[in-house]
């Protein structure tokens, strides 16, 4: 399993893209997707919602369990991936591409995000 070098990672197994005009794309890692099993339902934050770093903002339901979704940053949601709502299996099949979850206009990027190498060491994958 490979964690893309250009992304940053949280200890809750979310990834965050580099800021583009102050907006970051967020998803869960391949490690988290594999641990969840087949995702069958996604409840994502809605456009206009304010999310807070480290707090729950949605959930993913798999054939194994229901898991809270945490935001790695604080800010306003600018997009939610309707494709994932319609086809939650995208989280498993393409966690770093089509399986992204939501986008946030970042108010403040936390300092505790990990590099790809740090996340790999943390997760063991």
Swiss-Prot record:
- Any idea which UniProt keywords this protein has? Lipoyl
Disulfide cysteine pairs (residue numbers) = none
Q: Which PROSITE patterns match?
A: BIOTINYL_LIPOYL, LIPOYL
> Per the database record, which ranges form the Lipoyl-binding domain?
23-105
InterPro entries hit by this protein? 2-oxoA_DH_lipoyl-BS, Biotin_lipoyl, GCV_H, GCV_H/Fam206, GCV_H_sub, Single_hybrid_motif
| SUPFAM superfamilies membership | Single hybrid motif
Q: Which GO terms describe its biological process?
A: glycine decarboxylation via glycine cleavage system
Q: An example Gene Ontology cellular component term from the record? A: cytosol
What Pfam families does UniProt report for this protein, alphabetically? GCV_H
Signal peptide positions are none
What cofactor is needed?
Answer: (R)-lipoate
Respond yes or no to whether keyword Repeat is given for this record: no
Function comment = The glycine cleavage system catalyzes the degradation of glycine. The H protein shuttles the methylamine group of glycine from the P protein to the T protein.
Q: How does it assemble?
A: The glycine cleavage system is composed of four proteins: P, T, L and H.
Family assignment?
Answer: Belongs to the GcvH family.
Record's protein name: Glycine cleavage system H protein
